[in-house]
Design a protein with these regions (language model features):
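Conserved catalytic neighborhood of penicillin-recognizing serine enzymes
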Residues: 107-146
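Structured C-terminal helix/loop/strand segments within mature extracytoplasmic catalytic/sensor domains
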Residues: 27-43, 48, 149-150, 154, ...
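C-terminal motif of bacterial Sec signal peptides marking the signal peptidase cleavage site
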Residues: 23-25
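Short, conserved catalytic-motif segment at the N-terminal edge
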Residues: 49-71
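Mid-domain, small-residue-enriched loop/turn segments at the edges of structured enzyme/sensor domains
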Residues: 144-207, 218
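Acidic helix-start/capping segments at beta-turn-to-alpha-helix junctions
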Residues: 96-115, 151-153, 232-233
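Active-site SXXK
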Residues: 72-100, 135, 289
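Coil residues (strongly favoring Ser/Thr
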Residues: 47, 61-62, 98, 159, ...
């Protein structure tokens, strides 16, 4: 009996050892894949005349490069702004289709503002839905400035998004209007790549709503606002040569994003060239990717090419898993 018991114990120990080795092998394999992606990305970033920050998030992996650096967000903050406006609409028991009256003295006629090609009169009415759409899809600065002045301020936007973000490594202090006057203020509106990637991933989570996130009363208006924001992010017309450069080869890919483009700093470097996106394959698998470039001593086209190259590498890595 003692001999049988000893044999049984030895077999049990052998099985436990085998299981531990298998689990260890799986862990090593997954780590090697993650490191492999980092190595592939470093081959791109190591030669860039600037600082490149990357964050990739999927259900299985999170990979970051230079994530501890503070990157000027530029118009990426309009994603945060749109979500804060959606919350404020809900808090006021209002609607995204509410209309505000705008007078010419509220507008900057010398800033980037495609909406002024449509709204040419000295005074006009425009819905909050359209202001959000202009701010997101064409990065309209007047639309953003109006939303900050009329609906929710930069500081309130910062506070509200901190309540919902999985990663609060960001700061929003100044509007487009203020940054135009003093370009260096753009460095104060910063984000880590991981924070931006986390936020856009949250937005496209099917369970995400303004109501449950901000613990306010549920209304159809708030859900309508989030749906509108999601739709707008899929029709962003700026920076199509950045993360979305992979889209023509993969038309079946769901893609939504928000770009940000910076001024030249005192060293004549491009202060910011950014894109944060959400990608979903037809099989339902999805990932978020943020690429932020700061202090780049090249052209915007060259910076876009770097972002596009990173997007291609990440896509190839993800679909091969």
């Amino acid at each position: 009996m003692e001999l049988i018991g000893l044999r049984y114990l030895n077999r049990l120990l052998n099985l436990v050892t085998i299981c531990m080795l298998l689990l260890s092998s799986c862990s090593i394999d997954r780590t090697e894949k993650t490191v492999s992606l980092k190595e592939r990305l470093y081959t791109i970033t190591d030669t860039v005349p600037g600082i490149v920050g990357i964050a990739f998030i999927s259900d299985a992996d999170t990979v970051t490069i230079n994530n501890s650096v503070r990157y000027p967000m530029m118009s990426v903050f309009k994603l945060h702004q749109a979500l804060a406006v959606a919350h404020e609409i809900n808090a006021r028991h209002s609607s995204i289709d509410s209309v505000i009256h705008v007078s010419k003295d509220e507008l900057d006629m010398e800033t980037w503002s495609p909406m002024l090609k449509i709204y040419k009169t000295p005074c006009f009415d425009i819905s909050l839905r359209d202001l959000i759409k202009y701010a997101l899809t064409v990065s309209d600065n007047n639309a953003s400035n109006l939303l900050f002045k009329r609906i929710v301020s930069p500081s309130a936007t910062d506070s509200l998004i901190r309540l919902i973000s999985d990663d609060s490594t960001f700061r929003i202090v100044y509007s487009e209007d203020e940054m135009k006057v003093k370009h260096s203020l753009a460095y104060t509106n910063y984000s880590s790549p991981l924070s931006a990637a986390s936020l856009i991933r949250q937005v496209f989570d099917s369970t995400f709503t303004i109501d449950s996130t901000f613990t306010t009363n549920s209304t159809s208006n708030s859900n309508s606002a989030i749906d509108s924001i999601r739709k707008d992010l899929t029709t962003v017309a700026t920076g199509l040569d950045r993360l979305g450069a992979i889209k023509p080869q993969h038309p079946e890919l769901f893609f939504a994003h928000k770009t940000g483009s910076g001024y030249r700093n005192d060293a004549n470097e491009l202060s910011a060239h950014n894109d944060v996106g959400y990608f979903r394959l037809p099989d339902g698998r999805a990932y978020a990717l943020a690429v932020f470039i700061r202090d780049f001593s090249g052209t915007e086209a060259e910076a876009s090419e770097i972002i596009a190259g990173i997007s291609h590498e990440v896509y190839d890595y993800f679909v091969s898993k």
